[in-house]
């Protein structure tokens, strides 16, 4: 047992059987050791919910659990993430202050799956690796409270008030391997880049720290032309001269690679976190950047004026709730239902060009679009323009009333 004297002052919760939301990273791996040593836990279950980990990361998680003498359980949640989460994100043009709410979604999916597993296994507590300074602790706890309200929630890093350096030192005491490379959180929808250097506002992330994105100076000198098809609001196909890719997940993987190569998808922003403090966040999301830009444009073509005016309000509420840990909140469900119901007419095919960070729309077609140039254009007869005269008089009546009241604008 590592010497922890003086490292905590609160009374730690005690439990017998605990399911750990486990990625194999520093925080959750350390929990596997701390639970039996300081929380009285007799049985620890390490549960990895895969929403985008590589084979190497999965093997690292498995080997660390084995090193700790803890059984490891793997849940594949990528299909659910695509079908139930990314689809709603596209319908809602997901954006919280410019961030496509990827980690916000995955944490809540992971929390639900781990909570359900804990109940199935007869656990009396759930453990997760959040710090006390971030957003994930709120997201995870919200979901734990909804799906396993009677189970204790253990958060060792927060309860011991660890600094990152203390965690590294303690991992060394426990002989747990630690990869000192740049931290990240990756799904197919977005990858966040975590590093202490991000707090340095003069620092530019090195090219080698990106998975998909290339800086414009490293991007190809020739553009890449693509055709992307949407059906009922979702991208179903992307084609180039060399490839033809179908299916939402495959389209996203393809656009992450090709979009990133062409310098699309870097997000370097200031984010207002759940506790009200600003943080600098760096993300790469090439597929999300391309698809959301085209989806918004297609909605402008296919939705009514009133839908276009109202839907962004619903989208903002949806993104806010998801970011703040409310994926399963009733109002989030209501917003998602509205957005989904609006998508039946959002159909079209786009020809686009990717070039050194730009997304250029070359052409669009839609069988359900509301653009009617034969009516709007002055080059065609359309309707008798004289019919608009009486309509303008009716439309202006309120302004005549305002003038009589002496409320003219100065």
Please state what every model-predicted region is.
Residues 2-410:
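Nucleotide-activated chemistry modules centered on ATP-dependent adenylation/adenylyltransferase
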